[in-house]
């Protein structure tokens, strides 16, 4: 039986790492033990090199379109070399970010042309998409404060507050229009967030159970 692809999305400081643990815990309860974890950008040797270029300052400025193209290069390497093979083997994949991140950060935050974004997505990914996306919603002020508490911020995390407000607004619009996405209030206590995530996964499981 083919596996399923679950993605966790959200701004910096939303708690994606904890959410991943919650999802895996629920899957184990449901009898799904063979779970693969991925992150974007990254997840393959080439994709990890691209991740470093995307997240760190380089000798020359990285243009917005160059950033987006590197993200898609890393994404398709991960999809074709890791995610699709795992799904075909019946494994489940839990991803830290996927295409919705690019639509929100580069489409919303960077304000890149929507037509260009859509064309690139369709050209690179075709109809491939997650079976379930869990979006952790958080006010950028709260999220960035949490991120700063973890230590030094990367190149994208250093963007101004308006960038993250635009990114969040795009996330909210994307989730509203996506029947395969659920939104979780990530400003709650970690216990309530975990409970909401577990409930969302179980409800999705029941509605898709054959």
UniProtKB/Swiss-Prot annotation:
CDD domains: TMPK. ATP binds at residues 10-17. It catalyses: dTMP + ATP = dTDP + ADP. It holds the Pfam family Thymidylate_kin. GO terms for biological process: dTDP biosynthetic process; dTTP biosynthetic process; dUDP biosynthetic process. HAMAP family: Thymidylate_kinase (MF_00165). Belongs to the thymidylate kinase family. Phosphorylation of dTMP to form dTDP in both de novo and salvage pathways of dTTP synthesis. This is Thymidylate kinase. The lineage of its organism: Bacteria, Pseudomonadati, Pseudomonadota, Gammaproteobacteria, Pasteurellales. The gene is tmk.
